[in-house]
Amino acid sequence: AAKDIKFGVEARGLMLQGVEQLADAVKVTMGPKGRNVVIE
């Protein structure tokens, strides 16, 4: 939910999951055969 506030190790783990998801979505746009990605 948008209003959940997390602290400490739990917050770090959840943030890492989000960053990894974003990186997976964006990495296909890199390189000579880069494709378009829509992030909702």
From Swiss-Prot:
The keyword Chaperone applies. Induction: By heat shock. The keyword Chaperone applies. Keywords: ATP-binding, Chaperone, Mitochondrion, Nucleotide-binding, Stress response. GO terms for cellular component: mitochondrion. GO terms for biological process: protein refolding. It comes from the Eukaryota. GO terms for molecular function: ATP binding; ATP-dependent protein folding chaperone. Implicated in mitochondrial protein import and macromolecular assembly. May facilitate the correct folding of imported proteins. May also prevent misfolding and promote the refolding and proper assembly of unfolded polypeptides generated under stress conditions in the mitochondrial matrix. Belongs to the chaperonin (HSP60) family. This is Chaperonin HSP60, mitochondrial. The lineage of its organism: Eukaryota, Viridiplantae, Streptophyta, Embryophyta, Tracheophyta.
